[in-house]
Amino acid sequence: MMMNSMIRQGWQQVLRRFSIPTSGDRLIVSNSTDQPIGLFGAFDTSLQTLSQVTNDPEVLKQKSNIPTHLDVASVLEASPRSFPWVFLTNSFCTFGGSIHAQNLQAFATAEFKSGFCYMNLLIPLSFDIIDAHADSFRGFVEQLPDTLGAYPSLSMVLNVMLHAATRFPEIVASPIPTIAFDAESLQFHVTDKRGVPGMWNILKACRVYELLSLAADGIGCEYMLYPVGAAPQYSFWKKSMDHFTSDRFVEFLAMQDLLASALEQDYATHDARDALLSALQNAGYTNVVARERRFPNGHDPSIVWLNLSEAPISEKLTELKRYLLVGHRSDDTADITHNVHQHVFEVLKTMSVQFSKTTNAYNRARFEVNHKVIWNAEYGRGPQQNAELEALVLFLNRQSLEIENILHRTTSPVVVTSWKPDVPPAAPEIKEEEPTHAIATPITEAPSHVTPVEVVNLPPTRSYWAETLVGILTAILGTVFAFLTRALIRAKRLRRKSTFPWVTLNSGDDDDDQSGGGGGGPQTPGGQPPVPHTRGTHQSRFSVQDIASDTSLLSVDLDEDTLSQYDETFQKIRRALFETSFADILQNSARWISTLEAMALADGNAPYTLLAQYLNGIEEAYTNFRNTGHISRATLSGFFALEDNLRAAGIAFGTTTPTQTIQNQFADSPARRWKTRFEQIACELGDASIKSLADLADIIDTERERGDLTQFDVLAASSISSLCRAVRIISDTTDPNAQLALVENATAMQNNINAILGTNVSIPFLSATRRLLITRRVQEAGAESRSGATPETVQQLADAELAKIVSEANMYNEMAASQRDIANATREATIREHVLSPVNALANVGMAAAFFRSGGLRSRAFNPAMPTMPGGPAAAGRPMFQAFRGRGHRLNR
């Protein structure tokens, strides 16, 4: 029997990534600390046992002809049954008991890296997969190593095999390699062509169905938690990451307090400099994280660790320490304190996300996500990791504001005596399995021999007459500057002309142009009369305060009708945002966004692009919420950030912003209340659950009369109410055949609700009723056998009934597998949304900010090739809206 070519290609990809390299040691079984815990012995030592077991010299002959290292391609081309491999089993030591003849049914396998030996279980199954399932099985094989990682527990491996047997029924009777067990290290190993390690035991399982029966019998047993490969550690750890063991980590808040207190000191004395240098050298801990030592717990948002050994903070700290040690010797005593403060400023800036592009701050989630490592004893941390990452972002933003306040704080002229760094000692999380000596010595205080420094009170030297004179001169100069700015800049307008340099400045007051005196207004260089003054046609600079009320645009091509239309649209948008009118936003968003993009082309300084992004995002989020009943925290955080930027640009919101309205509707969603109550009822037993379901149906019917339900609320109400009534009908029905049909229908409704609401609810009443009906049918079949039927007929009836029960069980397993696939897909989509939404929001804000900094289309009048606004001829082949249009922007250089 040949392996399907598609499956063979998938195995080649897996073997290329996870098999032992040619230079690797193939004779040792290692644990998580790379210490040998088992050896593969020579085949000669087991010849006597082999002869006693098989008494078949032909097997020995075939064994001796097989090379030591089989070619992987030849193994994958042929059926494993052509290689009757014999493992090194011990006749006196078996795990669970097994006959040795069954263990001879084996096959040639690849040699996988330590921790991935469970992949050997899938190699013999590959030969029994039908062509219709080849594509699905290939994807299953390729995804499994990344899904389980290295060293999963035995229960996880058995769950995977149960899932595979459900999806691919043809593999139930397929053979599997021997699974060895070491009673000393308490770990399993799926053997390959090297055999069983010496003195290891073997599991009583030679085929898939025997392995699944072991999974059913071992529920709750301790050995189900033993690792397949080694003890808990970080999977995918690289040698290049070993530097983290010696890196120095310190709590973020402790380092911030240390530097903040350092800014309040005078460093004219040697003892003060030594105290700060000693505090910096002793700050933090080493040996915080390693392959077998997990990063400290990150559930508390305030516990954030700073890696002092990574750039850029390590470079700034080195400069500060070097200056405290020797650099200050060439400076005057009066300048030393100022220079030390400047170095401390630079270190603080590296800790703030506002001043530094990269951050050295970590919590557990950021460390594991950034370095792509997985703690193999814990899985399914996706939602928890997302929450920890969001908490880290909020923490860094909050501390950045605090650092900014520290940097702007004026230093006190009073010198504090006997200063000691205020660094609270805090040890990282110590796990039970970690030795106590793994934690380094905590931060130490300043040396006790520091001599007190005298308190110096500086006398006041202020001159009030000089300050008054400076204030008067400043006011006069400010008035003159404002007058010149208005007279020489705001009154000038750009005018086009038909000759080089294509534009000219036409100065003068707009009111004088309309007065009618003095022999007429000025003429343009082209000899044409000046354009009559209309509101908003002159070029003006926008300020943050007047953007919301001033509709002037930086363009000379807009006529009065276009400007009036833009002004009317802009006022409608402001009114809809202020009143939080989602009806207007959903109805007019497409037209409003198009108008805002056109306005952004005319005025590069106004926040029209940012406003268009906000309207588009709000519309999509609100529509998605009404259809699915879900919106992520990351999406809401992005909208809150956009609203803050719009407020800074002069866009006013009402008491409740659109984002707050969506958040409140999500929190008060009727579907969420029904879902919570439905999950609570699913845990009840007996008649109480039936009564509770009926009460829930009545509550839903009452609340369905509300007119503010979303589409998702209506769908959830219909599904849950139908299931509640179906359960009531089942409890009132006495006909077994009718009950079975109703149970099937109710089970389908239950699976549908789990798919819609993202739950994993199983009503005990349905499962109990189903088991009761199946038991009655078996008993009835037995009763029929006692009515004079022949033994052959009785056996046929029993086989038919058993086959039907097995078919129903398989169908139920298929539905459960489909439900798990849907839940996994939903969870992956949620993870992608949590990770990508804040990144996209920040990228959009950055693009809009870069667009405004580039000047928008202020250089448009100097470039005749740029497209014109509506009402004028547009350049062929150029889109209407283009970001980064400014000629001086760095993206255009």
Swiss-Prot record:
Organism the protein comes from: Barley mild mosaic virus (strain ASL) (BaMMV)
Catalytic activity: Hydrolyzes a Gly-|-Gly bond at its own C-terminus, commonly in the sequence -Tyr-Xaa-Val-Gly-|-Gly, in the processing of the potyviral polyprotein
The record's account of how the chain is modified after translation: The viral RNA2 of bymoviruses is expressed as a single polyprotein which undergoes post-translational proteolytic processing resulting in the production of at least two individual proteins. The HC-pro cleaves its C-terminus autocatalytically (Potential).
InterPro entries listed in its UniProt record: HC-pro, HC_PRO_CPD_dom, HC_PRO_CPD_sf, TMV-like_coat, TMV-like_coat_sf
EC numbers: 3.4.22.45
Site note Cleavage, residues: G229, A230
Protein name (Swiss-Prot/TrEMBL): Genome polyprotein 2
Protein encoded by which gene: RNA2
Positions with biased composition (Gly residues): 515-524
Family per similarity comment: Belongs to the bymoviruses polyprotein 2 family.
